[in-house]
Amino acid sequence: MDWDIVIGIETHVQLKTKTKQFSGASTSFGNEPNSQGCLVSLAYPGVLPVLNQEAVNCAIKFGLSIDAIINRKSIFARKNYFYPDLPKGYQISQFELPIVGEGKLSILIDNHTKDVRILRAHLEEDAGKSSHGLSHGKSGIDLNRAGTPLLEIVTEPDMSSAEEAVAYAKKLHDLVQWIGICDGNMQEGNFRCDVNVSVKKKGSDVLGIRREIKNLNSFKYIKQAIDYEVNWQIETIEDGGFIEQSTILFNPDTGETKAMRSKEEANDYRYFPDPDLLPLIVTDEDMLTIKDSLPELPSEMQSRFVKDLKLSMYDASEITSNKDVADYFIGMINEGASAKLSVNWIVVNLFSRLNDEEINSLDSPVKFKKLADLVLKI
């Protein structure tokens, strides 16, 4: 029996702000545990949240960059659940009226462009962090991360392979760094993906039961987790079993997924509007100011390179996948180097070597002027 794979992704993007979503506490990473707690994130009685305007600006900036609907009025809601690293007993999020509505992000697969529809993007606060396996079998709670601003970006189930899911995650990762709303450090948890996977009979309009793989913080793990999960679901169904909607974790050491709990529905969280926060209103002036602050977007630069420099769509996509790479390329062009040769030398020779050596492109020992001089001699 042939199968179709159906994938949707929810991405938690930690916004690049100096203070938390609803307080003035610092968001810096790596400090002593529980040194950045505040009365709001610790849920002291009587304290009130104050919205971080910079986080709002980041959300609007993202929405504009994917040509999404920006809701001029959005509502904050309480998402109620119990977990030790969530002292309030609820998370402040957005539910029925998010700040960013429908948009799209285009990915390049086998030299063909595919649009992945973005359903919504909403502001929320992060929870704290639990550490298990400490001395004497104890667990610890670090609330430094609690209250950190997040933008959760939710797609429609438009992806049909692990390769498409990885292409989308990489494109989104590049975009949020390009527009300056996230530093993209996946090891520090600043960009985390929850991947919803299901399978259905080929050509059927009836969707299968989905399982959600939580907290994937590496493109390699996204692919491995999806490949394993798809094979597991198909084998389970073909052997006469059934799929239960659940939340699962991926173990990179074994390459396997394992069920963690049954998957919650929205009504399990008992959402209701947060009475401590007024509706968020976005004005025309806000929109204009933020739009003017946006850099040239990767898609715009890609089209310009294809039209003006006669690059192929593939080469233009490669060179605009990262702002540092694009700036390096533009520097070489300004020195008079051939566009096509510059792309080849940057992508094939220089940056592939930097990746192998785990050197950041900004720290490249070969500056664009040196490489341009070399290309001009060819």
Q: Where on the chain are the PLM-derived regions?
A:
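N-terminal, positively charged regions that mediate nucleic acid binding
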Residues: 1-74, 79-81, 159, 170
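Charged, compositionally biased, marginally structured helical/coil segments
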Residues: 2-3, 46, 117-120, 136, ...
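Short, acidic Gly/Pro/Ser/Thr-rich loop/turn segments
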Residues: 14, 20, 125-126, 278-279
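Short acidic, glycine-rich loop/turn motifs
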Residues: 15, 105-113, 199-203
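Short, surface-exposed linear segments at secondary-structure transitions and domain or protein termini
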Residues: 32-34, 125-130, 217-225
